[in-house]
Amino acid sequence: MKAMETQRNCRTLSLKEIILCTLVLGIIGIIKCEDNMWVTVYYGVPVWREADTTLFCASDAKAQNPEVHNVWASQACVSTNPNPEEIELTNVTEYFNAWENNMVEQMHEDIVNLWDQSVKPCVKLIPLCVTLNCSLFKCIKENGNTTNCTVQISTGNDSTANNITVGTIDMYNCSFNATTELRDRKKQVYSLFYRQDLEPLEGNKPPEGDKNALYRLYNCNTTAMTQACSKVSLEPIPIHYCAPAGFALLKCNDKNFTGIGQCKNVSTVHCTHGIRPVVSTQFLLNGTLEEKVTVLDRNVSNDMDTIIVKLNETVRLNCTRTGNNTIKGIPIGPSQIFYGIETVIGDTRQAFCQLNKTVWTNTFKKVRHALNETYKGYLGNETITFGPSTGGDLEVTNLHLICGGEFFYCNTSILFNTSIIFNETKDDNITIPCRIRQIVRLWQRVGRGIFLPPIRGTINCISNITGILFAQQKTDRMNKSAMFTPVGGEMRNNWRSELYKYKVVRIEPLGVAPTKAKRRTVHREKRAAVGLGALFLGFLGAAGSTMGAASLTLTVQARQLLSGIVQQQSNLLRAIEAQQHLLQLSVWGIKQLQARVLAVERYLKDQQLLGLWGCSGKLICTTSVPWNTTWTNKSYDDIWYNMTWMQWDKEVSNYTDVIYNLLEKAQTQQENNEKELLELDKWASLWNWFDITSWLWYIKIFIIIVGGLIGLRIVFALLSIVNRVRQGYSPLSFQTLIPARRDRDRPEEIEEGGGEPDNVRSIRLVSGFLALAWNDLRDLCLFLYHRLRDLLLIVLRTLELVGQTLLKGLRRGREALIHLRGILQYWGQELKTSAISLLDTTAIAVAEGTDRIIEIAQRFGRGILNIPRRIRQGLERALL
């Protein structure tokens, strides 16, 4: 009866009311869930992070050129890109630090490797570390006479030539004992050495006249000397440093950038400009120029730091060594030949460098002005002065450069003497004297020396001064002056002067951000790999755009991501194919392989993460991971319309690992759900139910059901026994007859048959396993049926009550709205009536007041007008 009553009550709900309830519940659910956001994966976002990676070089080297730089570059570098691309990054500010730039360290290692290969030693000069018996050598003139070797440098033009004596070059003729081809025999040989390459033994004085003195080679007691196989020219060629795929080079284009700080004009490039690895001290040679003289200093208050001054115009430096000499080979042991000077014709060590005085004076003024502007905040009113190098090795106290294969050591003190520079003379050029040494202390390592064989003939080279290296001496507070002196020796500063505008960054194409889209369904689809090509630099072009604008170009950015790998692979393969007879697994070969493998590994790692998250082949991938508001307090609009991807990456970088783990767990759960869903597909066809492969499974299920029923029967029996024992009665067996009540309309038995005392009868329990199982299964099904029916009725009754409650609420809401509308109409009418009454009253009062004012004015006017009449009437009466 209750069920029928419930069904009748359910029918009272009309279809219109049910639809209305459903809409109300849906609106409530939408209102509740509209603020939820979900993690969305983006592939191809313009995000980068600072990194240190292995760069590779590119150059236009020609393998057929025997010059050592060409040979090295042809083996170590790939070809340059004929169409280099540079992309401006708008609205991007990046921090640069030239003194913490790993690119400088990499270039330093590479140039050390270049020098080790270029100045490759062949003969150890340990046999020459013997006592040398030397006497002063006389130079041979053209007419055959001999005289002291004095260098006279001609300056000025031909009409006003001045011969300036720079000094006397001491050349010694030394004899020593050398081992012959037979190790047990020695012979005495001689060779010419220059004073700078010798050092006297203890207690010996330099030779005078025809007297002899004992010497040994310079650095024989401190370094391991070797002799180069052949004289090399060491003419540097431009080398470009390039970032491997997956990385990029950021370049600062600010005009006032001084090496450290924020840069607002940033661009991205694949390779640097061509850098000539010129080894020199005091001056930067053959580098790049700036728009104005720029001072690069790490810390203006630190006197120990080297100051790099970049020029805005070049100063031409012309270096020459005239004369001629004769070279001979001296055997110093089995298969060892020392190449020395046999004789000298002319002033063979007449070495000097010249530069234009006007150009140098103007440049010097600009340098002084730039230093004043840079250090005025630190030095105050102190005057900046200049002076010569304060001391140290010859490579530091002199301008050390390579000219035509010879090592020049030039005295530059005259260039920093303001009294000479600003003195107006007729000389057009400034000449600085130079020395040439053949035993040279190598700059790349401590305790290494090399003997370079002399070169015949005249040597001339032209270099461009593009920068100066200074050291700030301690300030003289008494004289209120600060002195700057030229310095050098740390070749990293030479490379830093060219690389200070660059930095290496690692591209991070994977990004996560909150959106309102959620992954709803679980389905399988055919996924295609994203095609990638073109140039990868455009990938960072949208770095300054907001996240919403940048996400619209993800397709193009993702296509550009892998192109760097493809282009680099093809370039390297072409280089290997063209130079396979030269390219071996050297240091640079290992670096190239590292760069290639690293790029591919990073790309595969990103693709692996996308696969773990179920986003393979997708540029924008929604997920079912809810966005946690604790990760950021930014609103949806602030994130997508006010922030760039770089800013967003810094905002959530601390939670990236957490988000990645949640994405992986969500995808694992989704795959499990998908697997279970697919396993149910085999039951979609009825024919599959009778598949022979399922019979064993059916048998297993049957055995489980039977075992369960038996176990259930045993449990119920035990429970029944326990229950009856607790009641004080225990049945004799499970086959005890149960009395059953007889129907009322059935007649009783006759007396002969024993009769029955009442209308009850006994029925025996079922016997047999199948009957018992069937009875239990029937009872179980009936039990489940009754329970499910009751549950359904309860649910229907609940829905009915909820519907009635909602309808009552809607009716009451409608009545409340009608009542509110009536109230508003009533009070609106009352307010309208009151306003009209107020306006009428005000109008009447104003009208009455106006009439009174007009009447008073009229009376007052008439009184004034009647004054003459009253006067006349008064006079008339008086006269009468």
UniProtKB/Swiss-Prot annotation:
Region entry V1, spans: 134-173
Top-level taxon of origin: Viruses
One Pfam family of this chain: GP41
Annotated spans, V2: 174-220
Extracellular side: 36-701
Cytoplasmic-side positions: 723-880
Nucleus as UniProt keyword: no
Positions of transmembrane segments: 702-722
Region annotated CD4-binding loop, chain positions: 389-399
GO BP of this protein: clathrin-dependent endocytosis of virus by host cell; fusion of virus membrane with host endosome membrane; fusion of virus membrane with host plasma membrane; positive regulation of plasma membrane raft polarization; positive regulation of receptor clustering; viral protein processing; virion attachment to host cell
Entry-listed glycosylation sites: 91, 133, 145, 148, 157, 163, 173, 177, 221, 256, 265, 286, 299, 312, 318, 324, 356, 372, 381, 411, 417, 423, 429, 464, 479, 628, 633, 642, 654
Signal peptide start-end: 1-35
Stretches for region MPER: 679-700
Keywords: AIDS, Apoptosis, Clathrin-mediated endocytosis of virus by host, Cleavage on pair of basic residues, Coiled coil, Disulfide bond, Fusion of virus membrane with host endosomal membrane, Fusion of virus membrane with host membrane, Glycoprotein, Host cell membrane, Host endosome, Host membrane, Host-virus interaction, Lipoprotein, Membrane, Palmitate, Signal, Transmembrane, Transmembrane helix, Viral attachment to host cell, Viral envelope protein, Viral immunoevasion, Viral penetration into host cytoplasm, Virion, Virus endocytosis by host, Virus entry into host cell
Region (Fusion peptide): 528-549
Disulfide bonds, paired cysteine numbers: C57-C77, C122-C229, C129-C220, C134-C174, C242-C271, C252-C263, C319-C353, C403-C461, C410-C434, C615-C621
One Gene Ontology CC term in the entry: host cell plasma membrane
Motif range (Di-leucine internalization motif): 879-880
Any further remark recorded for this protein: Inhibitors targeting HIV-1 viral envelope proteins are used as antiretroviral drugs. Attachment of virions to the cell surface via non-specific interactions and CD4 binding can be blocked by inhibitors that include cyanovirin-N, cyclotriazadisulfonamide analogs, PRO 2000, TNX 355 and PRO 542. In addition, BMS 806 can block CD4-induced conformational changes. Env interactions with the coreceptor molecules can be targeted by CCR5 antagonists including SCH-D, maraviroc (UK 427857) and aplaviroc (GW 873140), and the CXCR4 antagonist AMD 070. HIV-1 lineages are divided in three main groups, M (for Major), O (for Outlier), and N (for New, or Non-M, Non-O). The vast majority of strains found worldwide belong to the group M. Group O seems to be endemic to and largely confined to Cameroon and neighboring countries in West Central Africa, where these viruses represent a small minority of HIV-1 strains. The group N is represented by a limited number of isolates from Cameroonian persons. The group M is further subdivided in 9 clades or subtypes (A to D, F to H, J and K).
Family membership: Belongs to the HIV-1 env protein family.
Protein name: Envelope glycoprotein gp160
